[in-house]
Amino acid sequence: MEIRTATMADLPAIAQLEAVCFPAAEAATEASFARRLEAYPNHFWVLINGETIVSFVNGLVTNEPDLQDDMYDNAALHDENGAWQMIFGVDTHPDYRRQGCAGKLLEHVIRQAKAQGRKGLVLTCKDKLVPYYAKFGFLSEGISQSTHGDVIWYQMRLTL
């Protein structure tokens, strides 16, 4: 399996994988992914098995220290020189879960953020995933201000 940055040609497969991984109220749309790919293609990574995208991670870079709901759909908030790498989604196809795919991608993104001199990475997750992200050094900051999808999210931060 290999990691590379996503391209517009990947858009249909990315949108399809998102629909498999998240309920409609939480899932990003294909149009939102297109805006993200246009604005920050170097911050959208896919894990490929042969020709198949099995996992992806994406998110903008900003000087804002906390992940905010408007960041998901407003790609113009990306600041390539920003201090914080936001992580909007860690999607892995169900057939590839519990095989280290998401971890491989997260480790890659963390290395990229270090190499780019970021202060760290921020993501939000459901409570059941807090221990998973803690394995990578993320610390829980408690319940996020996010109301995305009418779900309770926990903000996690990895300071580099």
Task: Specify the residue positions occupied by each region the protein language model found.
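Conserved acetyl-CoA pyrophosphate-binding loop and the N-cap/start of the following alpha-helix
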Residues: 96-108
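Conserved GNAT acetyl-CoA-binding A-motif
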Residues: 106, 111-125
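Conserved acyl-donor/pantetheine-binding loop and adjacent beta-alpha core of acyl/acetyltransferases
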Residues: 56-90, 97, 147-153
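Conserved catalytic-core motifs of GNAT/GCN5-like acyltransferases
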Residues: 61-64, 124, 134, 139-155
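A short beta-loop-alpha structural element at the N-terminal edge
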Residues: 1-14
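Active-site rim helix/loop that mediates acceptor-substrate recognition in acyltransferases
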Residues: 24-50, 58-77
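Hydrophobic adenine-recognition pocket in adenosine-nucleotide-binding enzymes
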Residues: 6, 90-92
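Residue-level recognition of the GNAT/N-acetyltransferase active site
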Residues: 93, 126
